[in-house]
Amino acid sequence: MKNIELLNNKKNTYFLSIGGIGEIGGNNYLYSFKGEQVIVDGGISFADDSLPGVDITIPDPYIFLNSNIKPKAMILTHAHEDHVGGLEYYFDKIDFPIYCNQFTFSYIKHKFNKIAGYEKKFIIIDNFQEIEFENFSFQLIPTTHSIPDPTGIFFTTLEGNIYHTGDWKIDKNPVTGSPFDYQNYQLLKDEKIDLLIGDSTNAGVNEISRSESELDPSFGKLFKKLNGRIVVTCFSSNI
């Protein structure tokens, strides 16, 4: 990246997509708040036919591992591979804390259990718990998605408030976890958001995203009709 030293500028706020914008997967972002940096997510992308023999790719972590950029922390929004799957490839080089909620940690910790003391790099926090640094603070804001306990991130900075949505959809009856809580977003409205960094996957589709729980009655009817073995396939991120 050219002018990487701009990220150490103590006068301005910067947002950099290392991966995840203009593509599906590879979510990896960097915020710089007057010279204090924080990384959001560290995902993988699934390779397509243009890369024969390659299964996955990861955004280049050079910017925050091998340059003059020294992040204060990494924050994980949820446990899907396109947001956390890259960590295992450079986990040993991370020398800053990784913040996430309990479910996300419980789901991904198996990736690192062969590394002695891996848990010391993680800091488990609650939703709405404020974590403060010199030039910014943040809170995890619960939302709904196709995995339990996903979150967005609300940043409070010296120059304004930023909301990073993470992956989300409005699900009033999720298979697991709490339903989408409109009150949480009313609170964000009251705080005033100066900048929104938002997930836009399928935003151009003019339809309502239905809840996965709507499949339950159909599955029940089908299973009652069958007497033999039943094999059900599902998307790889389903739990």
Q: Predicted regions span which residues?
A:
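His/Asp/Glu-rich metal-coordinating catalytic cores
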Residues: 2-75, 80-239
